[in-house]
Design a protein with these regions (language model features):
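Long, low-complexity, polar/charged, intrinsically disordered or flexibly structured peripheral segments
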Residues: 1-10
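Structured, hydrophobic secondary-structure cores that serve as assembly/anchoring elements
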Residues: 11-225
């Protein structure tokens, strides 16, 4: 089949990311592109955060079905094994990004109808709540700080599935036993391959927070005696 060229939306996202990579032009701590799963775009987003050194990219991943085909229709249920393999084959290695899976069901505010959204949509709420009730260096996960504004996860998970996702540095989102209607993030890994404190989101965000505060102090002292 002949190539149709790059997706126009991917090209636009990459152009925007090139602007965001400039610290002098923009300021932010978290980067999210809900529903953007293209490897070319997500790789560029990771590079942008690494170049800035003061932001974490929270990413959605490519979903594969049970037949190992890339899912284009959100109604198709993901095949966990093939999704993990697809992600692992990218061999991403960075402490400036974190991946979540799967999509979740939320209520549309206008009419309370259920809608399926990428995991990053729910995780932005988790991160915001974590920072409001605690601090960026607390883990945005678990029963205390990891609850999403959602009522169902697209994939039902047992312990084996949870472990497989976590071993692949994919943070699982699921409904724990006995908590029907409640969805939680149960992982806070970055994509750093080596065992290190920086393989955890809260540690990377702590260092980002320190770096930003030191920068602000330095700016205030600039040109002072």
């Amino acid at each position: 089949m002949a190539s149709t060229g790059p997706d126009p939306s991917d090209t636009l996202d990459i152009s925007l990311l090139s602007i965001l990579s400039d610290k002098s032009a923009t300021e932010f701590q978290l980067l999210v592109l809900p529903g953007q799963r293209s490897s070319s775009v997500t790789d560029y987003a990771i590079s942008a955060c690494e170049e800035r050194f003061d932001a974490l990219y929270v990413m959605d991943i490519v979903k594969k079905d049970a037949g190992d085909a890339v899912i284009e229709d959100d109604l198709v249920r993901p095949g966990v094994r093939h999704t993990i393999k697809e992600f692992s084959n990218r061999s991403l290695n960075t402490s400036f990004a974190a991946a979540y899976f799967p999509d979740v069901l939320m209520r549309r505010p206008s009419d309370n109808a259920p809608i399926l959204v990428p995991p990053t949509v729910g995780m932005m709420g988790v991160m915001s709540r974590n920072d409001s009730i605690a601090d960026p260096w607390f883990a945005p996960a678990g029963l205390n700080r990891g609850k999403l504004n959602a009522f169902e996860s697209q994939v039902q998970m047992n312990r084996d599935v949870l472990d497989s996702l976590y071993d692949a540095d994919i943070n699982p989102i699921y409904v724990p036993a006995g908590r029907e209607g409640e969805v939680y993030a149960f992982g806070q890994k970055t994509l750093l391959q080596d065992a290190s404190a920086l393989d955890r989101i809260n540690v990377r965000r702590l260092l980002i927070d320190i770096r930003r505060k030191v920068k602000k102090v330095g700016e205030q002292l600039l040109f002072e005696p």
